[in-house]
Amino acid sequence: MTTEKKSLGIQEIMDLLPHRYPFLMVDRVDDYEISDERKTLRAIKNVSFNEPIFQGHFPAKPVFPGVLILEAMAQATGILAFTMVGKPSPNELYYFASIDNARFKRPVGPGDQLVLDVEFLKERRGIAKFTGVATVNGEVVCTAELMCAKREV
């Protein structure tokens, strides 16, 4: 059995997510799988010194904030959710509902490429649960469990 590699470019990502510069934290999707056995997605966030956050965090020793790693992971889960169920209607948004068991293993800085691997676990009453792992050069930098909720606006 062969598996077709599926990817998404920035325009396709912008069609799915409401986020825009400077808060769009996913540059591309390298692969995703939506099957009965698994629902996974691999996304990329390129961390650049030109990002506004580095003006104050921290100018002499820039560190990409852990909360933004989690945001990138959450945006990757949103993309996975939308590839599973389709883009929300104009009066719907998916809200980041919770983070559990977030662990930060090492700092991330300019020049690093975050690889974001997320997996859908379950959905109940409009609330979806995911796991996420962020790596740089194959080394784990962050893990977390994430939940999002679909709501009308």
From Swiss-Prot:
It catalyses: a (3R)-hydroxyacyl-[ACP] = a (2E)-enoyl-[ACP] + H2O. The active site is at 57. Keywords: Cytoplasm, Lipid A biosynthesis, Lipid biosynthesis, Lipid metabolism, Lyase. It comes from the Bacteria. One of its GO terms (cellular component) is membrane. It is found in: Cytoplasm. SUPFAM superfamilies: Thioesterase/thiol ester dehydrase-isomerase (SSF54637). InterPro entries: FabA_FabZ, FabZ, HotDog_dom_sf. One of its GO terms (biological process) is fatty acid biosynthetic process. GO terms for molecular function: (3R)-hydroxyacyl-[acyl-carrier-protein] dehydratase activity. It holds the Pfam family FabA. Its EC number is 4.2.1.59. Involved in unsaturated fatty acids biosynthesis. Catalyzes the dehydration of short chain beta-hydroxyacyl-ACPs and long chain saturated and unsaturated beta-hydroxyacyl-ACPs. Belongs to the thioester dehydratase family. FabZ subfamily. This is 3-hydroxyacyl-[acyl-carrier-protein] dehydratase FabZ. It comes from Aeromonas salmonicida (strain A449).
